[in-house]
Every structure is written in C-alpha cells, then in structure tokens.
C-alpha cells in the first residue's frame, strides 16, 4: 500500500510503501483494541486507595455505655463500623490492578489501532522529525498546518531532543520513540505522525 510522505511544512515530498498486514488490516477488531486499552489503563492505576479497618482506626475500645437499661441498641466499641469515626467494613485496600494479556494480543492491538488510523486518513508519514531549535512557538506553527486538535508523534529508536523539548508544553501533543508506541495514545489522539524511520522499525517489530 502506497501513501504520501509529508514534510513538517505539510508539503508532499514523496511516497512510501506501507506493509498492508500492519497498516491496512481489512477487518478492524475493536474488541482487541478495547482489551489492550483496558489492560494499559489497569496497569497504569496506582492502586494506593485504602480505608482503615476497626483494628487500624485510632480510638478507644471502651464500651460506650452499659449493656442494659439505657434503651439503646447494645454497643461493644467506639471503633465499630457503625459508630461515627469508626472503621470501615470491606473498604478498598492497597493492591495492584494490573492484569495479564498475551503478547500476541498486545501486538494485534497495535496493528489494528494503526490500521484504524490509516483507514481514517489520520496517520501521516513525515520525512523527518527534527528541529533546529527547541522552540515551542515554532512547533505550534508547524502542527497548526496539519489542522488537528491532538497529535501522537512516533519517531525512530531515538527522539530528536529539540522536538521533544518543544513539544513538552503543547497541550495534547505527545512524542515517543517507536518502543513507546501504544494503543491507548494512538486511539485517543486525533492524528498519528510517524517518521520514515519509525515506519521501518515498526514494520520490523510487528512483522
């Protein structure tokens, strides 16, 4: 499958042949894409939520009032779950939310996400992702030429330091090396920009 190569000025500078098994899958599996996104989001959760149980909450274990004769329901401790300031029953505990997902499914998710963006016309191949200076204003002007609201930029094995620094302060713009390409960021950003080096490395990695 042939597609155009653009410069950072959004001008056509050539053509490149893309592997159809990676960038032009015929049937997009949304279920696989969702599986991989759920796996990513669960893995990213900190899991540090926690409430105190009866044994952990600060306070006395003294009986609040005598067993009989007050007309109240019997109580055994001021730290019980039904008392104000008491412990919490069955509350959240510190734990990992990470789940397991086979590597083949993760690989398929990336292939189908790239194919979906390509089918939408929102995946663009750029000849070079290098800037002379780390100027945010200059990069904003460049990205405005593509008329997109958000950009996920994938470079080769290494990211140009000037491009990376310039992109840091731009809302909804992320740049990563090819190893950082992931389904969640590909789907949530409007445009995916790939350098020519990224295309060749991704094709080798996902073959």
UniProtKB/Swiss-Prot annotation:
The gene is rplD. It comes from the Bacteria. SUPFAM superfamilies: Ribosomal protein L4. GO terms for molecular function: rRNA binding; structural constituent of ribosome. Part of the 50S ribosomal subunit. This is Large ribosomal subunit protein uL4. One of the primary rRNA binding proteins, this protein initially binds near the 5'-end of the 23S rRNA. It is important during the early stages of 50S assembly. It makes multiple contacts with different domains of the 23S rRNA in the assembled 50S subunit and ribosome. Forms part of the polypeptide exit tunnel. The keyword Ribonucleoprotein applies. Pfam families: Ribosomal_L4 (PF00573). It comes from Rickettsia africae (strain ESF-5). Belongs to the universal ribosomal protein uL4 family.
């Amino acid at each position: 499958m042939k597609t155009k190569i653009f410069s950072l000025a959004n001008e056509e500078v050539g053509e490149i042949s893309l592997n159809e098994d990676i960038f032009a899958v015929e049937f997009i599996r949304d279920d696989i894409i969702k599986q991989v996104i759920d796996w990513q989001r669960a893995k990213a959760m900190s899991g540090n939520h926690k409430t105190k149980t009866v044994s952990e909450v600060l306070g006395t274990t003294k009986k609040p009032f005598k067993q009989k004769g007050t007309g109240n329901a019997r109580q055994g401790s001021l730290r019980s779950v039904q008392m104000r300031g008491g412990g919490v029953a069955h509350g959240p505990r510190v734990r990992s939310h990470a789940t397991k997902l086979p590597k083949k499914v993760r690989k398929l998710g990336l292939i189908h996400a790239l194919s979906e963006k390509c089918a939408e016309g929102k995946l663009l191949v750029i000849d070079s992702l290098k800037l002379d200076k780390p100027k945010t204003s200059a990069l904003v002007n460049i990205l405005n030429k593509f008329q997109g609201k958000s950009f996920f930029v994938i470079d080769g094995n290494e990211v140009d330091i000037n491009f990376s620094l310039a992109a840091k302060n731009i809302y909804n713009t992320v740049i990563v090396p090819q190893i950082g390409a992931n389904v969640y960021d590909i789907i949530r950003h409007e445009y995916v920009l790939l350098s020519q080096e990224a295309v060749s490395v991704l094709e080798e990695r996902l073959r």
